[in-house]
A protein has these predicted regions:
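Short Gly/Thr/Asp-enriched flexible loops that form oxyanion-binding sites at enzyme active sites
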Residues: 129, 183-192
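Short gly/pro/ser/thr-enriched loop/turn and capping motifs at secondary-structure boundaries
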Residues: 80-82, 181, 204-209
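Short, flexible loop segments at boundaries between secondary-structure elements
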Residues: 146-152, 196-232
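A transmembrane-helix-recognition feature enriched in membrane-embedded lipid enzymes
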Residues: 79-84, 215-265
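Conserved acidic residues
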Residues: 71, 142, 171, 196
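N-terminal nucleotide/polyanion-binding subdomain common to many enzyme families
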Residues: 2-99
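Conserved beta-alpha
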Residues: 85-168
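Proline-aspartate-enriched helix->loop->beta-strand connector
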Residues: 165-174, 179, 195
């Protein structure tokens, strides 16, 4: 893929969703773009957006900056697709972060890309690496690390992590720390640790490592993955899903109204 090809992909596949730049790409197109990024060797960040992250990007200027400068922002949530469709901005494919990670690891095994897993609880990233190397023969996981709680406030620990990543020789970094911590870590450090592609992957390491049970595929396909997570931890997640996330509909109505006034709907 040439620079010209890259610009065509980006310019033709970008949509504005509630003021958030989304790349309207299939998983296969993302994989192909990643190949280009690895060959280019300029550090980039790839992130996904669900309702919770969309609200953070809308309401927090720094998060908006991070997502606006990301190489790819993919849609990781059925509600985002439903709202975008009603705004006459149909999204061609929901790209689930955990599913994308598996596809990326499959391709990494085929193309001899090296990966590094950062995040999750003690031992989880190790188990995830073991499972991935078993499922994708030839995959090279060159390192795993689970940072201690509060690592981002410890300069020595941060220096240790960045040095570890820089010396790893990895082509891709999968970070599972939850948002916004994982997004901020990548954004502020990727140029220093100099790994071509870094991904904010949330709970993907937990799913692959087996520490958290993922929702059945039928629930994910029908936009009910959030409900599965809620049933696993209702006390902690009730406010998030039934109070905080409801604010997305306010922003949706405001955006839709402004688009109608501008004659774009």
């Amino acid at each position: 893929m040439t620079e010209k090809d890259l610009k065509i992909v980006d310019n033709r596949k970008v949509i504005d969703f509630l003021g958030i730049r989304l790349n309207n790409m299939t998983a296969t197109e993302i994989l192909d773009h990643v190949d280009y990024c690895i060959e280019r060797k300029t550090p980039v960040q790839i992130v996904g957006v669900n309702v919770d992250q969309a609200l953070r990007v809308i309401e927090d200027k720094y998060s908006h900056q991070i997502f606006d400068e990301a190489e790819i922002v993919f849609t990781d949530g059925k509600p985002i697709m439903w709202m975008a469709d009603r705004l006459k901005r149909p999204i061609i494919e929901k790209v689930s972060g955990p599913d994308l990670m598996l596809l990326l690891c499959e391709r990494a095994a085929q193309k001899n890309y090296k990966i590094f897993l950062l995040g999750a609880g003690p031992g989880v990233a190790d188990k995830a690496a073991e499972n991935l190397e078993h499922d994708y023969p030839g995959l090279q996981c060159v390192g795993t690390y689970s940072p201690p709680f509060g690592f981002e406030r410890d300069p020595e620990e941060m220096k240790k992590i960045v040095t570890m990543l820089k010396d790893s020789g990895a082509d891709q970094l999968f970070v599972g720390m939850g948002s916004p911590k994982q997004d901020i870590f990548i954004y502020e450090n990727m140029k220093e640790y100099n790994i071509p592609v870094s991904y904010s992957m949330g709970a993907a390491l937990d799913f692959i490592g087996g520490s958290v049970k993922r929702a059945p595929k039928w629930m994910s396909d029908h936009g009910l993955e959030w409900f599965h997570r809620f049933t696993q931890n209702p006390k902690r997640l009730f406010k998030r899903y039934f109070v905080d996330d409801m604010k997305i509909f306010k922003y949706y109505r405001l955006f839709k109204q402004s688009e109608k006034v501008a004659g774009r709907l």
